Amino acid sequence: LNTEIPRRTGCPIPPISRRNTDALRYFMANGGRFAVATGRALPAFRMFAEQVPMNAPAVVCNGGALYDFKTERYLETMELPETIRGQGQDVLDRFPTAAVEAYHMDNVIHAVRPNEYTRQHEHVTHAGVQPVPTLLEVPMPLIKIMFEDDHEHLLALRDYVSRQPWSADYEVFFSDRTLLEVTRKGASKGAMVAR
């Protein structure tokens, strides 16, 4: 059994009721396997994971990775290619109000031009970001990047990205009106659960 943890603007993940926790423990004690699939990055989900009884690896970063909290290691990742940094920086250069968060595998979130949406996202996820001057300075490997701006600006940004020949290498989608995510082609929660 796998459940999704949806993202709700401005809302942290609510606590799990004792009734649900007891039901999950019963399910697992009787041979069931349970895990979570979330769009949240590992640093943003880690503290919540301690509240969720799981006996199977969790999907994080909208399907960009499969993580085993028992062994504290990634079992599978769909890393972005190194070219994403230059491509993403080109997008930032064309859209001056946009910020981008870059999710490194080592529990670090870097942010280029953090804006009000970056700060709101930090508040909701309780995961801090490390500001960097450009996306080119963010170390690899990356699991996902996420552009943050007003919805209207992100629509134009998404349209620009979709016209680039390299866009075929990625999944580009809104996880919220002010958040446009980029993961490797084929990365999704469902696809990672199926693995």
Predicted regions and their residues:
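Conserved acidic, metal-coordinating active-site core of Asp-based
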Residues: 97-195
